Structure formats: C-alpha cells, structure tokens
Regions:
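Active-site and substrate-binding clefts of carbohydrate-active enzymes
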Residues: 2-55, 87, 194-204, 208-211, ...
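Short, well-structured secondary-structure segments
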Residues: 3-8, 13-128, 154-157, 177-182, ...
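Phosphate/oxyanion-binding active-site loops and adjacent basic polyanion-contact surfaces
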Residues: 52-60, 127-138, 217, 225-232, ...
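Generic structural signal for well-ordered alpha-helices
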Residues: 61-65, 100-104, 135-145, 168, ...
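Alpha-helical scaffolding within the catalytic cores
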Residues: 63, 94-107, 188-201, 231-239
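Metal-dependent polysaccharide deacetylase catalytic core of the NodB/CE4 family, i.e.
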Residues: 76, 80-160, 202-221, 245, ...
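Catalytic domains of cell-wall/extracellular-matrix polysaccharide-remodeling enzymes
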Residues: 136-193, 256-273
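Terminal, compositionally biased segments used for targeting/anchoring and flexible tails
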Residues: 404-534
C-alpha cells in the first residue's frame, strides 16, 4: 500500500511600491500609519490577488471540495493539505473575503489538513542560532489558523521548504510531530524520497517531497516541448502507482492550477479527474501529512548540516535563490541587523513593517541567475529587473531604519538601545598590541564588562592609551556619558589592576543606571496600561 500525500502552498506577497520615493516626497509629512500604504503597491497586490482568485483559487477550491464530497462516503476518501501564509490571508481579508470563506468550507470538510509555517513567508529560520524570530512567526501563524479555521496544526513547513538539522530541532522544540522538505539526492544518496524519515538526533518525522513527480504537475504540465505532453490524470496516476515506497509526497504551489498553468491548458480538468484515477489503483490511498507521520515508522535519519541547508527552489535546491549575489546579501544582512533595534522600540507598527520586508519574495526578485531558474525568477519579478528590485527594497529598508533610529532616540528608549546586543561587525575586538588580536570580541555593554574582568591588563592598557574604548562607546554603542567617563580615567594614567578595578566600577555603575531607567519605564508603562483598563 502506498500513500499519496497532496499538499499545496498558498502565498501572495505584498509587493513593494516602485514609486515609493516620489510618493514620499509628494506626501511631505508622513506618520507611521501612512507607511504601509507608502511601502507597498496595494493597487498591484489587489490586481494580482483578484486575477489569481478568478483563474486559480476559486476554481481549484471548488474542484477539491466537489471531489472531497464525491468520495467522503467511500472507503478511499480524497484528502489534501494546505500551507497558507499569513500575508495571503491578510490579502483575502482586504480584497476577497469570499475566497477566505471558500477555504473555511474546505476546513469544515474533515478531509483537509492545515500546516503551520512562518507567518510572513520569511527566511527567519536562517537568522542566528536561537531562531527567536522564526519561532515568533510560526506562533503568530498558529494562532491565525486556530482562530480562522478552528484547527490546531500538528505539522509545520518552513518557507520554501528550507531545512537543516538545527531548524528541525527548533520545530521539534515547539511541539510539532512532522515537517516536509525537499527530497534532494545529496542528502538521500542511494535512498528514495518515498519513505518517512526522522531528523538527525530527533524524533521529528520528515516527509520528503518527490520533486520529479511534483514538478511534472507544477512546472512541466503545459510545456508542449515536454516528451510526456499532454499529461492527463490517468497517465499521472499510473506513474504514482509505479512508485515504490511508503508515501509519495506531492507538494506544489497552489497557483499551479490556473495561474502558472492557465485554465486553457486543461489543468483544472486534470485536478478534477486525478482523485478518481488514483482511486482506481487498489494500493493507492490519499493521506494527509499527519496521517502519514502516524502510520509509518521512520526508516532512517536525514542529516542536513547548516552549511548544507536545502530548499525546494531552483536547480541547486538550497538558499541561493535568496542569498547568493551581493545585492541579496547586503539586503538580507541589513534586514537581520534591524531585529534588535526594531524590537527595542516596542512599536507594533514598526515591527510589523519590518516583518513584511522579511518576505522571501523581495530577495528572490534580486536573483541574477541564468537559464531555467533565471527565467522563473524573471517571471515572478514585478520590478522589471533584479537591480530595480534591489534599488526599491534598499530605499524602503533605509527609510524604515531611519524611522526606527528616530524612535530609539526617545528618552525612554535610549537606555534600552545602549544595552542592546550589537550586530556582527559592530562589536569590539580586544588586541594585545597592533596586529595581535586576543580572539575576544564583545557585542554589548554587559559582554564588555564581563571581558574586562578576565582579559590581560596589557590589552586594557593598549586600548585605553589609544582611546579605542571611548570611540567604540561613543560611535557604536552611543553612550556619550560612559565614553566621557572612560576618557577621564585614561587621563589618570592608571596601570594594571588599578586600571582594571576603576574601569569595572565605572562600567558596573553605568549598567545598573541604564537598567534602572529601562525597568522604571517598564513599570510606568504597566501602570498606564492598568489605568486604561480601570
């Protein structure tokens, strides 16, 4: 018996406003509430959603619901699964509430499973080692699906099927039982994707997308140059029947059915006839991802190191669709570096805008790959060229960064900003003397204080005489007061333990002072909230 697991990814990004700069100049004074309309091209976004709904979403939902109803009283039911991004649902709420209702009808059928995923279709799983932002976005998505469909997802998929061992550990730590990723040869070697595996050193079940059979439907279906064209449901079902193993995972973009392949291609008829053609084969059964994970014990482990992260994108099937060329890398790193600052503001509007800019689509448009992958990148790019995509994104990200910094300059946030952890490249590296690094680099005042306790006094003397500590505190950390205090200490010409002791006392006093300010702000904020509720 072979399970057939059919899954759909449903996503539309908020595309950026190419005229952002001119629109900004025309408006003059801009408030935070104006930024969502300024940063994104909602006329274009609405147009794309409405067009895709007409050609794809409504017809496909209708077909799937009809086929579920057709087989729901039979032994071999038709079942599917959806991964729907949070930003897609937001667009439905804005411009197509009827479409959202049709997804709710599917949820009520009892034959549809919903997967969790990062709310903003982001690359947050690649941000640092603790993956705090990744976890927060999945939790936001989980709450959305629960509220909207009264459904508790048990299986999670990452954006574009990005996967490695560390990501899997995070998913397991959140309580998920299974995930899905690409069945890449370099991790499978001689093994087949048509089995259930588990993550390395984990109990998380891993379902692997059969990309050959998935892409027959998702990419090659309407290609008249393909030797198997035209593809009908009967032929495709026979290919599924010939596949050995526990399960065949078919995972495609939902836009396959009417948007990527237009209705004239026969894709809707293919979808309509597929359940029945599969059910003609006695050993084929439709299953949801959680059913597959429960039915089959894993036959082995999938081992994917972080340096070998996989995805379902392009021929490389790695993160290079988004992080490859200098334009993509600069934007990705700049976006990541804003996390501490934007969250330090505590401003929900700014945090939400920063998260919208995390949508992987923005970096995808900057790809300069050639060949087949390049054609796909160009097809989806609303900016016309990778350079234009880079220019528009950079302008908007820079504008957001400037507004975040202005927010952080407010007195109540200044202390929090000084205590923040600095991004890579902004830390202080201790040297013993010129060209003799100690190997110690700190990224916050508290790390600086802790390192001063143990670093050799020759390093402290080297930096205090050159004014390095003061410059870093003033120009990078932004603590002018502390910088001035260290300048005064350097004038005293202290040496050895006496110098270390004076620096530590000054640092300890300043850190306590800053923490007291932030704690006082927190107390006042809580007090104001209590007043509002009484």
């Amino acid at each position: 018996m072979t399970d057939i697991c059919l899954m759909f990814e449903v996503h539309q990004p908020f595309r950026l406003n190419r005229k952002f700069h001119s629109d900004l100049m025309a408006l003059g004074k801009v408030t935070k509430k104006d930024l969502f309309s300024l940063y994104f091209d909602h006329k274009l976004n609405r147009h794309v959603l409405v067009r895709a709904a007409e050609k794809c979403y409504f017809p496909a939902n209708s077909i799937i619901l009809e086929q579920i109803d057709r087989y729901k009283r039979e032994q071999k039911k038709f079942k599917v699964a959806y991964g729907i991004s949070g930003v897609f649902i937001e667009q439905c709420e804005r411009w197509s509430p009827d479409l959202l209702e049709s997804f709710k009808q599917l949820s009520e059928s009892g034959c549809v499973e919903f997967l969790d995923e990062p709310y903003y279709h982001s690359l947050a799983s690649l941000h640092g080692t603790d993956r705090t932002e990744f976890v927060e976005q999945i939790e936001l998505h989980h709450q959305l699906i629960r509220d909207l469909f009264n459904y508790e997802p048990r299986v999670v998929e990452n954006t574009e099927c990005l996967y490695n061992n560390a990501i899997a550990k995070t998913m397991e730590g959140m309580g998920y039982k299974a995930t899905v990723t690409e069945g890449v040869e370099r991790i499978l070697r001689w093994r087949s994707p048509n089995y259930v595996y588990k993550a390395k050193d984990s109990n998380l079940r891993v379902l692997l997308r059969n990309y050959s059979l998935s892409d027959d439907m998702g990419f090659r279906f309407s290609s008249t140059l393909w030797e198997e064209w035209p593809l009908n449901a009967s032929k495709y079902a026979s290919w599924l029947a010939a596949a050995s193993g526990q399960v065949v995972v078919l995972f495609v973009d939902y836009e396959t059915f009417g948007e990527h392949h237009w209705p004239e291609s026969g894709i809707h008829e293919f979808l309509e006839w597929l359940p029945g053609e599969v059910n003609k084969w006695d050993h084929l059964w439709w299953r949801t991802p959680s059913e597959v994970a429960c039915r089959h014990a894993p036959i082995g482990e999938i081992d994917v190191h972080e340096y070998n992260t996989i995805s379902w994108a392009d021929l490389e099937r790695d993160p290079s669709a988004w992080i490859n060329n200098p334009m993509q890398t600069v934007c990705y790193e700049s976006l990541k570096e804003l996390e501490k600052s934007v969250k330090g503001t505590g401003d929900e509007d700014l945090i939400r805008l920063w998260r919208y800019l995390q949508m992987s689509d923005n970096l995808y448009y900057m790809s300069i790959k050639g060949g087949g992958p390049g054609d796909v990148h160009s097809y989806f790019n609303p900016m016309g060229s990778p350079v234009e995509a880079f220019a528009v994104y950079s302008r908007i990200l820079s504008d957001l960064e400037a507004r975040i910094l202005v927010e952080l300059e407010k007195p109540e946030l200044t202390a929090k900003r000084m205590l923040r952890r600095l991004p890579i490249g902004k830390g202080f590296t201790f040297f013993y003397e010129f060209a003799r690094p100690s190997g110690l680099t700190v990224h916050s005042l508290e790390e600086f204080y802790a390192t001063l306790k143990t670093v050799d006094t020759s390093s402290i003397r080297f930096h205090i005489e050159k004014g390095d500590f003061e410059r870093w505190l003033r120009q990078v950390v932004g603590d002018i007061k502390l910088s001035n205090e260290l300048t005064n200490i350097s004038k005293k010409r202290l040496r050895g333990k006496a110098l270390r002791k004076r620096l530590l006392a000054t640092m300890e006093r300043r850190i306590k002072e800053l923490k007291g300010i932030t704690e006082g702000t927190s107390v006042r904020t809580k007090h104001r909230r209590r007043l509002k509720t009484t």
